[in-house]
């Protein structure tokens, strides 16, 4: 079904391009009967591009000499991205801007099958990146307490929809953080336009917390809030699910250096992440509400308490750094900050936990909204976060579900600048479109799909949204 929609879109865009090309060539022919065909004995020149800025699929005109009249003989590039050539008329060519070619674009042209002798435009082109928030599924304003599976037109998400993760096939996983039948684990398959129930919350384990896909085991794990439980889901075995529990270290493990939790059962555990300690040993880490950082391995499920994080007790979500597996990033909800744990250091080291963004130091601050440099940027109840690279600049960026501000923020770790990419700060609502028009209502979960799209769980509106970059 999805493939058919994609193909229809391509045919539709191709039809538009053909019509525009005919209009363009016709107008050029009427206004300038003396235009010439391409002459291989003469040089090809590109003097200017008009307009010299724009976004994805915008129309621009190249002006020059000896461009010919056959658009099929022209190949135009914005940096490394090839554009669609709609029409040509001797001294002009009509082009559609390609997707995400880079902020500052050098325009190059190859003509008549030549693959080496690129002709460059004397002007550059400024690409204006555009974020678009799109609806995926769910019923806006639903009052159902429980999840209703089905196709995208009938799916309803229950109360307390929460965090997201994606597997390599692009399937999205979501938890409902509540006990009983309201606390369901579900998956969302956009390729098949359907959602499916996996399991309910458990009386002993408590509310299902954040899902996390582990590349090592190739399974999805939903953390449970109580007693060290977690759900293990196998996407490659019909989503078979098993409820498992972490084990306290006995005398034998304690003799190896494992440390037990001293306050009874592990409680209020939110999310898992895989990372390496100072010795290069790989563990799965979790941070409890009271600030306790502990770790374990799936092979034996015996946990080891690392210590208490300097920032102390707070609702949190943790995520790893895809490029530095000694770092764990923590969004600290009530403190309105994001911190970084450096596992290459001892937990007693002053540099073990540092503030990445948000004001007020390790103690945090009262929630508010402010874009700008990290010295002034403010959040209000940050929830799930993720780290990735900007597809154009390759700068490391972090996306933050700024729940109470009803928006998604982007923090650039290279420039220390915070911007808003979806929703309008402090304005709840429901609206798709650009950052200036889109509205959210308590965005709480976020994940990155294999093809680079960002999915958002909007708990206030009871929908899944998708942030696309154009």
Could you describe each region identified by the protein language model?
Residues 1-27:
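Sec-dependent bacterial lipoprotein signal peptides
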Residues 28-135, 173, 186:
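Ser/Thr/Pro-rich low-complexity tracts
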Residues 62, 129-160, 191-209, 236-268, ...:
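Gly/Pro-rich loop segments of beta-rich domains
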Residues 163-164, 209-211, 270-274, 316-320, ...:
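Hydrophobic core register within WD40 beta-propeller blades
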Residues 166-169, 213-217, 275-280, 321-325, ...:
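Residue-level detector of Asp-centered blade-edge/turn motifs that repeat once per structural unit
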Residues 171-174, 219-223, 281-287, 327-330, ...:
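Conserved beta-propeller blade signature
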Residues 176-179, 223-227, 235, 277, ...:
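Short loop/turn segments immediately following the C-termini of beta-strands
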Residues 441-470:
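Blade-level signature of beta-propeller repeat domains, shared across WD40, Kelch, NHL, RCC1
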